[in-house]
């Protein structure tokens, strides 16, 4: 019997999840950045800048942006590594990748963009100085496999950054639930004409591992000195780990 996994609150066959997630992101790609600004009141930009500040990048370094979508982090990383460095933008979803590529082309930038699965990265071992995945890990079917792949492609001494929605501070749970399950789908319907995708967003956040659980998963994948930093009362957490 085929194994099952969660797609939001639904239980689906593992073989079906990727296609269902793809449908969500094909649907929201064109309005993705606008919705991020609306949903977070612009805070997502601060979260991402904090993540980049924790990357420890220098000119000439190689960075892999997994599930990089519309290239917010890629564009920030490019400023850090300079002309002598490399930033690879990847995403499994072509619609999202196209949005990111087009944004960079409009800015006169031409970094490489690769459509690939974060659970099966087509890159050599011990290659990148830094790997990031922002708001992408929770959509992956086999998170442990994805973390192992990110560990594989990092060079010894390199670091992984996982920026993801997490478990909010308990006194705020009721208000956060109201916002997530009532306002998010409403905004999705009004702005993107797609309430269902934002209902999935709220559900996928609740099903994603919390701070300590994700820390343990990273350690199981081989990362050392794993730590995390909560932002906005735990709405988002940045996990950081190193390959030794």
UniProtKB/Swiss-Prot annotation:
One of its GO terms (molecular function) is demethylmenaquinone methyltransferase activity. GO terms for biological process: aerobic respiration; menaquinone biosynthetic process; methylation. It comes from the Bacteria. It is an enzyme of class 2 (transferase). Gene3D superfamilies: Vaccinia Virus protein VP39. The keyword Methyltransferase applies. Its EC number is 2.1.1.163, 2.1.1.201. S-adenosyl-L-methionine binds at residues 70, 91, 117-118. Pathway: Quinol/quinone metabolism; menaquinone biosynthesis; menaquinol from 1,4-dihydroxy-2-naphthoate: step 2/2; Cofactor biosynthesis; ubiquinone biosynthesis. It catalyses: a 2-demethylmenaquinol + S-adenosyl-L-methionine = a menaquinol + S-adenosyl-L-homocysteine + H(+); a 2-methoxy-6-(all-trans-polyprenyl)benzene-1,4-diol + S-adenosyl-L-methionine = a 5-methoxy-2-methyl-3-(all-trans-polyprenyl)benzene-1,4-diol + S-adenosyl-L-homocysteine + H(+). Pfam families: Ubie_methyltran. Keywords: Menaquinone biosynthesis, Methyltransferase, S-adenosyl-L-methionine, Transferase, Ubiquinone biosynthesis. Methyltransferase required for the conversion of demethylmenaquinol (DMKH2) to menaquinol (MKH2) and the conversion of 2-polyprenyl-6-methoxy-1,4-benzoquinol (DDMQH2) to 2-polyprenyl-3-methyl-6-methoxy-1,4-benzoquinol (DMQH2). Belongs to the class I-like SAM-binding methyltransferase superfamily. MenG/UbiE family. PANTHER family: 2-METHOXY-6-POLYPRENYL-1,4-BENZOQUINOL METHYLASE, MITOCHONDRIAL, METHYLTRANSFERASE. This is Ubiquinone/menaquinone biosynthesis C-methyltransferase UbiE. It comes from Thiobacillus denitrificans (strain ATCC 25259 / T1).
